[in-house]
Amino acid sequence: GNGFTRKSGKAVLIGGGIGIPPMLALAKALKEEGAEVSVVLGYRDGDLFLKKEFEPYADVYVSTEDGSVGTRGNVIDAIRENGLDADTIYACGPMPMLRGVKAYAAEKETEAQISLEERMACGIGACLGCVCNSTDVDSHSHVHNKRVCKDGPVFNAEDVTL
């Protein structure tokens, strides 16, 4: 599969729920490479995890659905409230969050890389259990599909239909 392509400049990393832990190593690597890193972590409530672990590598912002900590609402609400901008957005989390990230990135004309969370039965692309819709046609199969296990799990947001 493919991971995040690290780029220099301003980076906003967005993690929601179980998509938060994968962003920690990326935050560390980007910081070590000289990027200006901000992290937005989305939680349901004030039961925060990994926030302190991100702090050495990034400015950390939090959104909670219940408003108990940080911005009340979702990660996009937190980005807008804090006036964050980026050369590249990196995101991992639930599908509704990724849809919001994709729409926000398109609105701001900013590159976004998203990591899809899909069940992967075989892990080698044979079973097609992890297929997602893509915006381009595969030259071999002539369909609009990508295998998350082989072609992803990270995609440019504009390359997939969520």
How should each PLM-predicted stretch be described?
Residues 142, 157-162:
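SAM-dependent methyltransferases
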Residues 1-119:
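FNR/FR-type flavoprotein reductase catalytic core
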Residues 22, 95, 118-153:
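Local cysteine-cluster metal-coordination motifs and their immediate loop/turn environment
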Residues 50, 71, 145, 151, ...:
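Glycine-rich, flexible loop/turn motifs
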